[in-house]
């Protein structure tokens, strides 16, 4: 894939806006169903400010808010990129996954909540799927995504939080397509969620999407990058969040971030207005490796 302007080109030739607004983390409902009016307003502001990529998921419980915001703003459907994810459950295989029979059925239900006929990208949220816990294995789960794509319910399909082994299980199977995206936690303090996953994904033409890209300044202080980011912020006349997001982008990775503040929304969109020198990009990469910060998916901490 390649970055051209404000878009990445996926391995299947389709394009994806190069930064996404996330509706998880602080907006994650954790089981309650009350409509989040603040999120609706924030999404409307983000869309009106120029965001064209909204990242959602079944487990976040925010699809109705996304749908309402889209309707209120009134953009042409083709001009907005919507991501959804199948709730596959956690690493304990405890049965607490999607209430729907399979990923295909889950997407159809999510589309009703979104008020849409299709999503632009549909992902398996976690690889924790087995015949015992779900009634189908990981490869069969992928075939449900292929069915959704073939029927026009999802324009692109991919995965999230997959290891090399997980990816190989799909790539080595006799499937009709391969994932175009692997969405993982990625930041300067976590440059591989699991061993070798970024390089391997990119070698296979799979775009890495990064959640948690601002960890070094939101949860990683004090840290070895503090002085580096301060100097680069002064050099480029950009704030430290913009420096980190631009670094992610220049690594060929799509950053996902979120905020409720108007100035921060505009800050994110300005990462396309400057470029880090190669030596500065490399310095962030090198110094970032001096610390490990894992904000999510703590089951992967065995690799730290």
From Swiss-Prot:
Family: Belongs to the aldo/keto reductase family.
The protein's assembly and partners: Monomer.
Gene3D superfamilies named among the record's database cross-references: NADP-dependent oxidoreductase domain
Organism expressing this protein natively: Candida parapsilosis (Yeast)
UniProt-recorded name of the protein: NADPH-dependent conjugated polyketone reductase C1
Active site (UniProt): 60 (proton donor), 125 (proton donor)
Keywords noted in UniProt: NADP, Oxidoreductase
GO molecular function: 2-dehydropantolactone reductase (A-specific) activity; aldo-keto reductase (NADPH) activity; oxidoreductase activity, acting on NAD(P)H as acceptor
EC number: 1.1.1.-, 1.1.1.358
Gene designation: cpr-c1
Pfam families, A to Z: Aldo_ket_red (PF00248)
Temperature characteristics of this protein: Optimum temperature is 50 degrees Celsius.
Organism superkingdom: Eukaryota
Ligand binding (NADPH): 23-26, 55, 160, 183, 214, 259-261, 264
pH dependence comment: Optimum pH is 7.5.
Reaction it catalyzes: (R)-pantolactone + NADP(+) = 2-dehydropantolactone + NADPH + H(+); isatin + NADPH + H(+) = 3-hydroxyindolin-2-one + NADP(+)
Functional description taken from the UniProt entry: NADPH-dependent conjugated polyketone reductase with broad substrate specificity and strict stereospecificity. Reduces ketopantoyl lactone (2-dehydropantolactone) and isatin. Does not act on menadione, p-nitrobenzaldehyde and pyridine-3-aldehyde.
Entry comment on modification after translation: The N-terminus is blocked.
